[in-house]
Design a protein with these regions (language model features):
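Histidine-/acidic- and/or cysteine-rich, low-complexity loops and terminal segments associated
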Residues: 2-83, 107-108, 146-152, 174-195
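Juxtamembrane transmembrane-helix termini in multi-pass membrane transport proteins
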Residues: 3, 9-13, 78-124
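Selective transmembrane alpha-helices of multi-pass membrane proteins
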Residues: 20-32, 147-173, 253-271
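Residue-level signature of transmembrane alpha-helical entry/exit and packing/kink sites
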Residues: 23, 27, 74-78, 115, ...
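C-terminal ends of transmembrane helices
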Residues: 95-105, 172-176, 240-249
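A small-residue-rich subset of transmembrane alpha-helices
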Residues: 110-140, 215-250, 256-263
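Transmembrane alpha-helix/helix-exit interface in multi-pass inner-membrane proteins
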Residues: 128-143, 147, 158-185
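Alpha-helical transmembrane segments of helical membrane proteins, especially in multi-pass transport
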Residues: 168-178, 200-228
Length: 271
């Protein structure tokens, strides 16, 4: 049975070897490009221009399909937007796990580089599935008149407060705690679940993605509260999982965040 090499026994040359550098460069490039896209497209994505952005547009011949949130064009644009946001928001907090995997993986440099990319792709595959769900939810909310296409923020303070309160409750569940613990200890996670080869990298990437999803899905849905394309709100929500994952477990950052979310829900109802 193969054993996982201990990171502290690896020479500096291996820690700075090509697979680690390539993984780090790929992560950095993906994060920078995703954030660059968000900054280059700061206006709300309302599907080829919504009725609120151009008065009278909905009355023009042929524009009905363009304004339909269930049209293929709109759903594809919404999915792409959510997928890019998940890359920008979730890859930074996953970077320690991904780089650790690249460091301790065995095999030739080509095999380690391949395994690192498989790990990243499978991790992102989980968030891609979430992005599909989020895009469909967005279309349903717009179609139901609950999410204005020009802001992509919930119109109802009651509904927004309910979503924030639900996220606070999830923070207090044992499932959230279990998922967060897996994300807070990259070394323990890799040592427990690491398997050699491409298949091992695929399983590890999917497993980490699922734990990360269980930890952060409710926070990501809060994008509907402050605005799906509100850059300040996106940055704030991206910071929350990062803080949860890098702070010591004894600090119970998830519990503090639950309290803040409950206060936020109350504020939405009060004001």
């Amino acid at each position: 049975m193969s054993s996982t090499p201990q990171p502290e026994t690896l020479p500096l040359a291996r820690l700075l070897s090509r697979p680690v550098l390539i993984s780090g460069a790929a992560l950095g490039l993906a994060i920078v490009l995703a954030w660059a896209w968000l900054f280059a497209n700061p206006m709300p994505m309302d599907g080829l221009g919504g009725p609120d952005s151009m008065p009278g547009m909905a009355d023009m011949p042929g524009m009905e399909a363009a304004l339909d949130p269930w049209s293929a064009d709109y759903l594809l644009a919404a999915f792409a937007m959510w997928a890019l946001m998940m890359v920008a928001m979730m890859l930074p907090s996953a970077a320690p796990m991904i780089l650790l995997h690249a460091r301790i993986d065995r095999g030739t440099e080509a095999q380690r580089t391949r395994d690192s990319f498989l790990f990243i792709l499978c991790y992102l595959a989980v968030w891609t599935i979430f992005s599909t769900f989020a895009a469909l939810t967005q279309a349903a909310l717009i179609g139901g008149g609950l999410l204005p296409s020009h802001t992509l923020a919930l119109d109802s303070s009651v509904l927004a407060a309910g979503l924030v309160f639900a996220a606070a409750l999830w923070q207090l569940t044992s499932a959230k705690t279990a998922c967060l613990q897996q994300c807070q200890s990259p070394l323990q996670f890799v040592m427990r679940y690491w398997r050699p080869g491409a298949a091992g990298a695929v399983r590890l990437g999917l497993r980490h993605g699922l734990f990360c999803l269980g930890c952060c899905w409710s926070l990501m849905l809060l994008l509907f509260v402050g605005g799906v394309m509100n850059l300040a709100w996106i940055a704030a929500l991206a910071l929350l999982p990062f803080i949860e994952k890098v702070t010591p477990p004894l600090w119970r950052a998830d519990r503090w965040l639950a309290g803040l979310l409950m206060l936020g829900a109350a504020a939405l109802l009060a004001f």
